[in-house]
From Swiss-Prot:
<comment type="subunit">
    <text>Part of the 50S ribosomal subunit.</text>
</comment>
<dbReference type="InterPro" id="IPR019906">
    <property type="entry name" value="Ribosomal_uL6_bac-type"/>
</dbReference>
<protein>
    <recommendedName>
        <fullName>Large ribosomal subunit protein uL6</fullName>
    </recommendedName>
</protein>
<keyword id="KW-0689">Ribosomal protein</keyword>
<dbReference type="Pfam" id="PF00347">
    <property type="entry name" value="Ribosomal_L6"/>
</dbReference>
<keyword id="KW-0687">Ribonucleoprotein</keyword>
<dbReference type="GO" id="GO:0003735">
    <property type="term" value="F:structural constituent of ribosome"/>
</dbReference>
<dbReference type="GO" id="GO:0002181">
    <property type="term" value="P:cytoplasmic translation"/>
</dbReference>
<dbReference type="GO" id="GO:0019843">
    <property type="term" value="F:rRNA binding"/>
</dbReference>
<comment type="similarity">
    <text>Belongs to the universal ribosomal protein uL6 family.</text>
</comment>
<dbReference type="InterPro" id="IPR002358">
    <property type="entry name" value="Ribosomal_uL6_CS"/>
</dbReference>
<keyword id="KW-0699">rRNA-binding</keyword>
<comment type="function">
    <text>This protein binds to the 23S rRNA, and is important in its secondary structure. It is located near the subunit interface in the base of the L7/L12 stalk, and near the tRNA binding site of the peptidyltransferase center.</text>
</comment>
<keyword id="KW-0694">RNA-binding</keyword>
<dbReference type="GO" id="GO:0022625">
    <property type="term" value="C:cytosolic large ribosomal subunit"/>
</dbReference>
<dbReference type="InterPro" id="IPR000702">
    <property type="entry name" value="Ribosomal_uL6-like"/>
</dbReference>
<dbReference type="InterPro" id="IPR036789">
    <property type="entry name" value="Ribosomal_uL6-like_a/b-dom_sf"/>
</dbReference>
Length: 179
């Protein structure tokens, strides 16, 4: 039984939700507009200021899609009202980030600098040389872009050098001891 799927979603003021017959969900809000194709098996109803998601049968696939669909719609509504952001911390001697127009320039200890173009719908701020703030209205895009940047130089367990999320804790290891 999907407990998450059974919860109705309240539509806040200033947000407009439309669902077509083939479950194409469009959410417009103060921060922008998101369009996403939901699973066709699910039944999505928009009534007054609430959205309910129900499943046609009790087979395993429908049960698993039930909570997923409800969460996807909820994330779209939250994205167009509040937005999402991830903060990355860069640690290490000589490791730093800078912004040049729409390009992010990273010095991560390699022999070359790494330049990344900001994807559509995502903004990257560099308040300090060692901090990146990635924000946007699509939760999946923000998370994917943050993960790609983190993968350029993941944190290592001995000195903690690399790129990590702000709320991430790195388990440190003890180095080898001399004789």
């Amino acid at each position: 039984m999907s407990r998450i799927g059974l919860k109705p979603i309240e539509i806040p003021n200033g947000v407009e939700v439309k669902v077509t017959e083939d479950n194409l969900c469009t959410v417009k809000g103060p921060k922008g507009e998101l369009v996403e194709q939901m699973p066709k098996e699910m039944i999505i109803k928009v009534e007054d200021n609430t959205i309910t998601v129900s499943r046609p049968s009790e087979i395993k696939r429908h049960k698993s899609l039930h909570g997923l669909t409800r969460t996807l719609v909820f994330n779209m509504i939250e994205g167009v009202t509040e937005g999402y952001k991830k903060t990355l911390i860069i640690e290490g001697t000589g490791y730093r980030a800078a912004k040049q127009g729409k390009k992010l320039v990273l010095n991560l200890g390699y022999s070359h600098t790494i330049e990344k173009e900001d994807p559509e719908g995502i903004s990257v701020e560099v308040p300090e040389q060692h901090t990146l703030i990635i924000s946007g209205i699509n939760k999946q895009q923000v998370g994917n872009y943050a993960a790609k940047i983190r993968d350029l130089r993941g944190p290592e367990p001995y000195k903690g050098k690399g790129i990590r999320y702000e709320d991430e804790h790195i388990r440190r290891k003890v180095g080898k001891t001399g004789k």
